[in-house]
Amino acid sequence: MGMDISQFDFLYDTSEETKTRFVSFIGDSMKRFDLAITSSNRFYGKKLVTDIQHGKTAIIGPDDLEAEGYLEYVFKLTEEEAAELTAFLEQVVGTVNFTDI
């Protein structure tokens, strides 16, 4: 038997307009990246980055790009592939905003 919606304890349930950039590129490693990069009012200005080919998504800001091994872990990349993705995302992610605290 399914759960009635009144049985859920929602932490939040909101809708908002977002902006999504779709981009596909290949670097020196010959790894093809097909990404959807979503900008939202959530996540302190970080971007929601989705690898469309593999169905993996991460919330990424400049601090995440500096975290050693993070992109390799999240997107299952080699070190060379992660370096290429980092080089691209450094141009995209911008700064983190803590305006909603």
What residue ranges belong to the model's regions?
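Negatively charged, low-complexity tracts enriched in Asp/Glu with abundant Ser/Thr
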Residues: 1-34
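Generic, ordered loop/turn and secondary-structure boundary motif
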Residues: 12, 26, 44-45, 66
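Short, highly charged low-complexity linear segments
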Residues: 14, 49, 80-84
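Generic structural hydrophobic/aromatic packing signal, biased to beta-strands
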Residues: 23-25, 35-37, 60, 85
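Short amphipathic alpha-helical "recognition" segments used for binding
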Residues: 23-25, 50, 70
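A short, structured beta-strand/loop element
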Residues: 39-63
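Helix-rich interaction surfaces within compact, conserved domain-sized segments
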Residues: 65-101
